[in-house]
């Protein structure tokens, strides 16, 4: 089992942060990165939902100390409902915070082929477009850092065999057996058996589908200007830009995209000008100066965008939309 050369090339050129849980997948990734002599640090969320949660945290700290790595840990609150989504949002918000504050270029995730197929089936069951169904890529650019998934075309069976072959220590996550979580239900009843039997064909299919996705949705059309993501008024491109800002849209949110300016998830704003969509972090300002408001009016700057421009001291005349 090896990390692809193109991903290794990126890892060798940047500052890297591994999302670590001490589960099987991130433990394999830790081993592979060490084997390739890649420099990286660790970030971990303790949800305190398992009997071994605190022991896993302790052992992760010991591992970081042993190999002279920084480790960033955050304890999650108790989520009363919709655990999967809230836990995911909490996790990625913290990962992004650390990447931005500490200057990491790459966030390394241990998603593998089974995860990719589970996601595919979950989105298919909910009603989703191509951009959402193929929501995982090996290299995924965010606004200020890049997500890397070196194991995305490696199956869970291959990971399990590698763990046994190399005698790699890891913690078993018993919560993965609980079918009250939709992902686990999909995994146990549909995806795992399929991947085990058809993993080679599945790898080829996802590779072909990703190439088709790139041709259908030219993501090079998403431009970044001073923290603003700008793209044509296209639902899939807008959804992609919003995702680059760290928000994964629900089906209901996607339906609202083309209706007009709006705030998504309370943190990402979307505004339109001249058939261009502008995606940015939602900000407010107590009071805009009268001369700035007039400048915005003349330039026909969307109201939702004005506070962001003012707060970041962006020259309106420098904008090309």
Curated annotation (Swiss-Prot):
Principal EC category: ligase
InterPro entries reported in the protein's UniProt record: Rossmann-like_a/b/a_fold, TilS/TtcA_N, tRNA_Ile_lys_synt, tRNA_Ile_lys_synt_N
Show the catalytic activity: cytidine(34) in tRNA(Ile2) + L-lysine + ATP = lysidine(34) in tRNA(Ile2) + AMP + diphosphate + H(+)
Identify the GO cellular component terms for this protein: cytoplasm
Entry's localization field: Cytoplasm
Q: Sorted alphabetically, which keywords does the UniProt record give?
A: ATP-binding, Cytoplasm, Ligase, Nucleotide-binding, tRNA processing
Keyword Nucleotide-binding belongs to the record: yes
What name does this protein carry? tRNA(Ile)-lysidine synthase
The principal location of this protein is: cytoplasm
Q: Which Gene3D superfamilies match?
A: HUPs
Give the GO molecular function terms: ATP binding; tRNA(Ile)-lysidine synthase activity
| Amino-acid positions noted as binding ATP in the UniProt annotation, renumbered to this chain | 21-26
Q: Which family does it belong to?
A: Belongs to the tRNA(Ile)-lysidine synthase family.
Purpose: Ligates lysine onto the cytidine present at position 34 of the AUA codon-specific tRNA(Ile) that contains the anticodon CAU, in an ATP-dependent manner. Cytidine is converted to lysidine, thus changing the amino acid specificity of the tRNA from methionine to isoleucine.
What highest taxon heads this organism's lineage? Bacteria
Q: Could you give the domain comment from the record?
A: The N-terminal region contains the highly conserved SGGXDS motif, predicted to be a P-loop motif involved in ATP binding.
Show the Pfam families listed in the entry. Answer: ATP_bind_3
A Gene Ontology biological process annotation?
tRNA modification
Q: What is its EC number?
A: 6.3.4.19
């Amino acid at each position: 089992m090896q990390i692809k050369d193109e991903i290794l090339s990126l890892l060798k050129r940047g500052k890297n942060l591994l999302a670590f849980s001490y589960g099987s997948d991130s433990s394999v990734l830790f081993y592979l990165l060490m084997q390739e002599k890649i420099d990286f640090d660790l970030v971990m969320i303790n949800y305190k939902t398992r009997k071994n949660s605190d022991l896993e945290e302790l052992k992760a700290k010991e591992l970081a100390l042993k190999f002279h790595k920084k480790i960033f840990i955050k304890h999650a609150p108790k989520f009363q409902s919709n655990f999967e989504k809230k836990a995911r949002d909490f996790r990625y918000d913290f990962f992004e915070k650390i990447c931005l504050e500490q200057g990491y270029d790459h966030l390394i995730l241990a998603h593998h082929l089974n995860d990719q197929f589970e996601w595919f089936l979950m989105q298919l069951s909910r009603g989703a477009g191509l951009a959402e169904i193929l929501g995982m890529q090996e290299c995924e650019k965010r606004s200020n850092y890049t997500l890397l998934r070196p194991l995305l075309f490696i199956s869970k069976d291959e990971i399990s065999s590698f763990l046994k072959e190399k005698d790699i220590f890891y913690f078993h996550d018993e919560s993965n057996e609980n079918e009250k979580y939709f992902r686990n239900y999909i995994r146990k009843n549909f995806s795992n058996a399929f991947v085990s039997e058809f993993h080679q064909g599945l790898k080829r299919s996802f590779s072909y589908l990703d190439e088709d996705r790139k041709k259908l949705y030219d993501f090079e059309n998403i431009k970044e200007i001073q923290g603003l993501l700008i793209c044509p008024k296209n639902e899939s491109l807008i959804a992609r830009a919003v995702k680059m800002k760290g928000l994964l849209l629900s089906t209901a949110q996607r339906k609202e995209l083309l209706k007009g300016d709006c705030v998504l998830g309370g943190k990402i704003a979307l505004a339109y000008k001249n058939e261009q969509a502008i995606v940015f972090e939602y900000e407010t300002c107590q009071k805009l100066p009268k001369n700035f408001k007039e400048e915005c009016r003349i330039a026909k700057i969307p109201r939702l965008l004005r506070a962001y421009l003012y707060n970041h001291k962006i020259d309106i005349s420098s904008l090309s939309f």
